[in-house]
Amino acid sequence: MNQIDYLRISLIDRCNFRCQYCLPEDAELAYVRPQDLLTREEILTLVKNVFIPLGFRKFRLTGGEPLLHPEVVEIVRDIASLSATSDLALTTNGYLLDNLAEMLYEAGLRRINISLDSLDPDTFDKIIGNRGRSRWQKTWAGIQAAQRVGFDPLKLNVVVIPGINEAEVEDLAALTIEKRWHVRFIEFMPIGNGDLFQEKAWIANEELRGRIRAKWGLNEGQVRGNGPADVFQIPGAKGTIGFISQMSECFCDRCNRLRLSADGWLRPCLLNETGQIDLKTALRQGISPAEIRERVRELIELKAEINFKLRDSGTSSGIYTRTMSQIGG
């Protein structure tokens, strides 16, 4: 079994965007009550006393939108200050990043992923649900702030939706030519908006690779990250292009992560709901970190059987009960 050493931690299930593929505007959402979210202290306890003793060294803060969490800078500082932490990253939509980039960097964050599904303001606003006001410029300002502060690598995540932003693949890939940015194309998944998934389906990354290769050529990248992306590079480019192909290509045997939701549920597989365990309730019932650690160890041992490689969603109807923002992405 692959070494499991990477934990994705959702800080909050709320988001200031309503992206079509995640939190569509017409969806009714039951947000977690503030008192039911993991506290800063509980997150640190789990990281320090449960996950690090089990060999976890890499951590990523997600959401929802993690920058909406009032203590996000402090949580970054808490985890970054632990000597066992070898890598700490954060995924954001970038909208609030312009004002927070420097504070996050000073707190110890060095890697950041920013969602950018379009370079066209109108298309961007259509995807994120702009509610009558454009948000592209402020998001772009957040990306510029992250570069200015010194985040390296700076990664841009792109979810390609047929008929909406698929024509921009080459333009987004071109961002890597003059900048040391990493653009990652992520196949559209059936979590969050099953109706849109059924209507639009998804485009296999092999097709996108073919389009980029036809325009510039494409070399296999020399550097791999912590995740499942297959990395390539346009000849002579400063940055790289990654493809996360969770729908068309099975990468379960490379999976090295668990996911902790904002309300404390530990999930072994993004696309399979089997085997989740409630760590928050265990903590609040006074169960010791040592006993919780054993429960997590048992889940890790089962992870290879739970992974999505058999295309089992772990649901009775095939419909996921939690959205991407609730899971933590």
Swiss-Prot record:
PROSITE patterns tied to this protein: MOAA_NIFB_PQQE, RADICAL_SAM
Residues reported in the UniProt entry to bind GTP: 8, 60, 91, 155, 257-259
Keywords: 4Fe-4S, GTP-binding, Iron, Iron-sulfur, Lyase, Metal-binding, Molybdenum cofactor biosynthesis, Nucleotide-binding, S-adenosyl-L-methionine
Positions annotated to bind [4Fe-4S] cluster 2: 252, 255, 269
InterPro entries according to UniProt: Aldolase_TIM, Elp3/MiaA/NifB-like_rSAM, MoaA, MoaA_NifB_PqqE_Fe-S-bd_CS, MoaA_twitch, MoCo_biosynth_MoaA/MoaC, rSAM
Cofactor(s) listed in the protein's UniProt record: [4Fe-4S] cluster
Presence of keyword DNA damage: no
Catalytic activity: GTP + AH2 + S-adenosyl-L-methionine = (8S)-3',8-cyclo-7,8-dihydroguanosine 5'-triphosphate + 5'-deoxyadenosine + L-methionine + A + H(+)
Record domain Radical SAM core: where: 1-229
Gene Ontology MF term list: 4 iron, 4 sulfur cluster binding; cyclic pyranopterin monophosphate synthase activity; GTP 3',8'-cyclase activity; GTP binding; metal ion binding; S-adenosyl-L-methionine binding
GO biological process, alphabetically ordered: Mo-molybdopterin cofactor biosynthetic process
Assembly notes: Monomer and homodimer.
Family as reported in the entry's similarity comment: Belongs to the radical SAM superfamily. MoaA family.
Protein name listed in UniProt: GTP 3',8-cyclase
Species per Swiss-Prot/TrEMBL record: Microcystis aeruginosa (strain NIES-843 / IAM M-2473)
Protein's gene: moaA
